[in-house]
């Protein structure tokens, strides 16, 4: 794959990836590092989609979750969207266990999002707050599983009706 990608980005026999030639062989030891940095930068600025690992920023007991699906039929999730996730790391005495399928609200995303005043909000990591599954009989929104939310959360959650998360948050950005 790297050879096909590099062959499209060559200019006069010199690769823009810094060391990969048209044959796919390495010219320098720095070429593979440049390719991995390029792929990391591209991954960090995309939607939260299937396979994305997110940090859990509440005290529900989970540490890391992996996104299974973004709800509402979207191709990916952004700030304030609800996702279905699988718990990958958990505390031994937490409310949720490893391997459990949970719902979560995205409270921090590395992909930038424009605000009405022209500014843009972007966070350093992708983070989620776990919420309970909504019953069909109740008409209330999903409530957080934990009782504390760590770190900043954007005020755009107010538009998405996640007021309980805003009330539990330490800092609203």
From Swiss-Prot:
InterPro entries: Ribosomal_uL14 (IPR000218), Ribosomal_uL14_bac-type (IPR005745), Ribosomal_uL14_CS (IPR019972), Ribosomal_uL14_sf (IPR036853). One of its GO terms (cellular component) is mitochondrion. GO terms for molecular function: rRNA binding; structural constituent of ribosome. CDD domains: Ribosomal_uL14. PROSITE patterns: RIBOSOMAL_L14. One of its GO terms (biological process) is translation. The keyword RNA-binding applies. Keywords: Mitochondrion, Ribonucleoprotein, Ribosomal protein, RNA-binding, rRNA-binding, Transit peptide. Mostly expressed in leaves and inflorescences, including floral organs and meristems, and, to a lower extent, in pistils. Signal peptide: none annotated. It holds the Pfam family Ribosomal_L14. It is found in: Mitochondrion. Residues 1-61 form a transit peptide. Belongs to the universal ribosomal protein uL14 family. Binds to 23S rRNA in mitochondrion. Part of the mitochondrial 50S ribosomal subunit. PANTHER family: 50S/60S RIBOSOMAL PROTEIN L14/L23 (PTHR11761), LARGE RIBOSOMAL SUBUNIT PROTEIN UL14M (PTHR11761:SF3). This is Large ribosomal subunit protein uL14mz. The lineage of its organism: Eukaryota, Viridiplantae, Streptophyta, Embryophyta, Tracheophyta.
């Amino acid at each position: 794959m790297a050879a096909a990608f590099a062959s499209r980005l060559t200019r006069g026999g010199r690769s823009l990836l810094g060391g990969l030639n048209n044959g796919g062989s390495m010219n320098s030891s720095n070429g593979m590092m440049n390719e991995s940095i390029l792929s990391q930068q591209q991954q960090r600025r995309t939607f939260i989609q299937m396979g994305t690992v997110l940090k859990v920023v509440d005290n529900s007991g989970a540490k890391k979750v992996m996104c299974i699906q973004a709800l509402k039929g979207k191709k990916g999730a952004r700030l304030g969207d609800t996702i279905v996730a699988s718990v990958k790391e958990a505390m031994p005495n937490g409310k949720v266990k490893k391997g459990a399928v949970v719902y979560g609200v995205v409270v921090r995303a590395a992909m930038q999002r424009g605000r009405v005043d022209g500014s843009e909000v972007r966070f350093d990591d992708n983070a989620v707050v776990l919420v309970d599954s909504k019953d069909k009989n109740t008409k209330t929104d999903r409530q957080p599983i934990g009782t504390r939310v760590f770190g900043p959360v954007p005020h755009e959650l107010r538009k998405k009706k996640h007021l309980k998360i805003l009330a539990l948050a330490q800092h609203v950005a």
